[in-house]
């Protein structure tokens, strides 16, 4: 990856998250050098829960549409942004309370795309993919810690959605 050519790396996980993807991705950026790496976090491409309430799984109408399902992700926009960077166009990332918008420069040779959404994209978009997994108990513990502190979520909501 340090050959000066353009490379795109996918870092994703299975389950509801908190598997260590973001932590690993940030450390990898530091290791490879910020001056040559873009980190595109895919979490802002997850459709907000209030809009997902409008969807229902036909076979199981009583169940919620969680982020574990592709329909909960704005995949076309994420794919467009990845292709733009790969094609030499800068992008401005989606603004979220926990992740302010920033400009990513297409001049950087390495693009790391990190998040659950990546699992639902065509594998040919990436030169290398790394998949993380964590058990349910560890996932809940990490989500309670991170989502309360960073995403301003209530512990009760996290526990309820973890059971969904």
Give the positions of each predicted feature.
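Pre-Walker A adenine-sensing motif
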Residues: 1-4
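Hydrophobic anchor at the beta1->P-loop junction of P-loop NTPases
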Residues: 11-13
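The conserved Walker
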Residues: 16-17
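Walker A/P-loop
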Residues: 22
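Post-Walker A helix-loop "phosphate-sensing" segment adjacent to the P-loop in P-loop NTPases
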Residues: 30-39
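Conserved nucleotide-sensing/catalytic segment adjacent to the nucleotide-binding pocket
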Residues: 38-41, 47-98, 110
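ATP-dependent NMP and nucleoside kinases share a basic, alpha-helical "lid"
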Residues: 102-150
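Small-molecule kinase domains that catalyze NTP-dependent phosphoryl transfer to phosphate-bearing small molecules
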Residues: 150-164
């Amino acid at each position: 990856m340090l050959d000066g050519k353009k490379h795109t790396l996918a870092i994703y996980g299975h389950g509801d998250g908190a598997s260590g993807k973001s932590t690993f991705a940030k450390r990898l950026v530091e290791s490879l050098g910020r001056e040559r790496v873009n980190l595109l976090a895919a979490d802002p491409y997850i459709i907000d829960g209030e809009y997902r309430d409008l969807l229902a799984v036909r076979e199981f109408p009583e169940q919620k549409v969680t982020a574990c399902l592709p329909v909960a992700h704005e995949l076309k926009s994420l794919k467009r942004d990845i292709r733009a960077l790969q094609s030499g166009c800068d992008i401005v990332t989606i603004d979220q309370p926990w992740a302010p918008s920033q400009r990513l420069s297409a001049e950087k040779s390495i693009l790391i795309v990190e998040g659950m959404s990546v699992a639902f994209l065509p594998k040919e978009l990436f030169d290398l993919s790394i998949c993380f997994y964590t058990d349910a108990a560890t996932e809940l513990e990490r989500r309670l810690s991170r989502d309360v502190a960073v995403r301003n979520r209530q512990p009760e909501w996290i526990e309820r959605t973890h059971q969904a």
